[in-house]
Structure formats: C-alpha cells, structure tokens
Amino acid sequence: MRMRTGFLLLLVLLAFPLAILGQDATPEATPEAAPIELPAVDPLAVTGDIVTAGSSTVFPLSEAVAQLFIDEGFSGAVTIDSVGTGGGFERFCGKGETDVANASRPVKDSEVEACAALSPARTPIAFRVGTDALAVVVSSANDFAEALTCQQLAAAFSGQAATWADLDPSWPAEAIRLFSPGSDSGTFDYFVEAVLEAEDCGNLGDEAEAAILGAANIQFSEDDHVLVQGVEGSPYALGYFGFAYYSEEADRLKALAIDGGSGPVAPSFDTVEAGEYLLARPLYIYSDATVMQDKPQVADFINFYLSNVDSVIGDVGYFPASTEALNEARQAWLDAMGQ
C-alpha cells in the first residue's frame, strides 16, 4: 500500500510542473492572411473610357484612384458622377448605362432584380474598397455640445426633440437646424438603419424613414458640400455625412462623440479600427463580370483600384479595409475574370 501511495505521489509531482508549463505557454498568434496579388496593370497600355456613378461618400475615393490611374499613364476618360448610392444603382441596374456603381451600402434585392431584368442581364459584384466613419457634426461655434447618446441623436433627427434643450436641459432652448443627405443617398439609408431603426437607439422600426423625412427644420441635399456649409453657418445646426467631408473642414466643424451604450467615442482611425465607434460602415464599388470581360479597361481599372486604394485612402479621409476584406474583393475580381 505504501508503494502504491508513493507511486501516486510521484505521478502528482511529475504532473504539477507540466501543468505549470502548460499554463505559462503562450499560444501562437494566428498570422494575418497574406494579401492576394492581382495581375499587374500598366495604365499606359489601357485604352477606352470608364463610366462610374453613385455614392457621394465614395466619390472622393474613386476620384483619387482615377487621378492616380491617369497620372500613371491612362489616356482615356474616367467619368465619376456623384448622384448618391441609389442613383448609382439606378444607372447601373435600372438603365445599364454605367460600368461601375459606387456605393456606401450593400446593393438591395430590388436593385439586383433590376440588374437581372436588363438585356443582357447584369449580376452586381461587390468589391470592398474601404471603411467610412459617419461624422455627426456641429459648427465650431457650438460651445455646449461635445457628445450625444445614440438616443439623443435619434430624437433630434426623428423630430422628437425640437430644441437643444429637449436633448439636454443645460443646453440652449434654440431650435435644432438639421442637415441630412437626401433619400437617394446610401449615407441616408445607413443612418436610418443604424440610428433611427435600431432597437437600442431610435427603435422606430418601419416608421424611421417617414420620421426623418417629416422632421421639422431639416434640409436635405445629395451634395455633401451643401450640408457642410449649412452646418458651418449656425451654432445650432446638427448634421451628418462621411468623415472625409468633415476632415476637409475640421477647423470650422466639430465632430461629436457618440455614445452607443459604452460611453462616448469620437471617430478616429484607432476607434474605427478597434470597432469602438458606432457609426462605421463599409464602402464598395460594384460591377458585373460580363461588363468587365467585354470592356478590359473596366477590369483593369477595378484591378488598379483594389491594388492601390490603400495608398490614397488615408489622404482622402477614410480608413483601409482589412486584408481579409480586400482579399475577398480581389478574389471576386479573379472569379469574374475566370482566373
């Protein structure tokens, strides 16, 4: 019996340091996926024109990539119309008159159906190109508001709060002058969904869009520069638009921190990258495999876009997509081209 007890004790003593070693061992970090490399594109060798239209948010990013494409030798024309995401899909799917649609939201089922009804039919392919943070802004002359809860933001844009004092009794009893992108804008769609419809925010459900469209003292525009100027013009104005437009006028505007339930968080590279800022959203360009195969210049432009977007996106004022998201976009390009 003593020998058996001693044997068991020996096993315990031997196992103890192994357990300690196992606890101290540091698990290996999962390596980040290597970027997929697309075939090299020489802009000097690309001929033909490219027509794009859509999101005003994606517009400055596409403009920067197109300028780089031209700077490196492309001699054709790149048309980029800022008509809102909905307007872009109308021209791409409803009329079939553009090669690329710029979008600040995913394509809707109704838009996919419109693409399928074209002759020849189109199938929209999404290419993720970056991330935008929606900036909720006031004039730099506003000296009382630094942050809003998601519920306060929803109350303002749904018309439930008419004055700043309705949001916070310590703020002025002055009417809130609202500025919003129009209903054709993907930015508008995203705001309605993320702020007004969301259960933990506005909780307006199917009534959300009607609420903002019926709000008093609100100005809508598909031109973000009009919204910027409107907010700049009054200390009692409140607006929202893509972070790049805020960045251009940061000396005259103030971006408010947004509290989604874990404390106020201001938009920045770090907070967007960490997933801490509530109002961050993906940016896309869309095309179709047949369009890309029939128009090599379109395929080459999208290839160039996906290969070079990270070199310009920071200067524009947006945030890079993850390697994984860009790899999915690059793989979608390869699949569309049968490679």
Predicted regions and their residues:
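Short helix-loop capping/hinge motifs at secondary-structure junctions, enriched
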Residues: 141-147, 184-187, 201, 291-295
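N-terminal segment of the mature folded domain
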Residues: 31-159
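Short beta-strand->loop
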Residues: 51-55, 138-139, 164-184, 287-288
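Ligand-binding "clamshell"
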Residues: 111-126, 247-273
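Small-molecule pocket liners
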Residues: 125, 131-136, 175-177, 253-254, ...
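Ligand-binding pocket segment of bilobal, Venus flytrap-like solute-binding proteins
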Residues: 89, 180-265
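Extracellular/periplasmic juxtamembrane helices and adjacent flexible linkers that interface
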Residues: 2, 42-47, 275-276, 284-339
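Ser/Thr-rich, Proline-interspersed low-complexity disordered segments
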Residues: 9-44
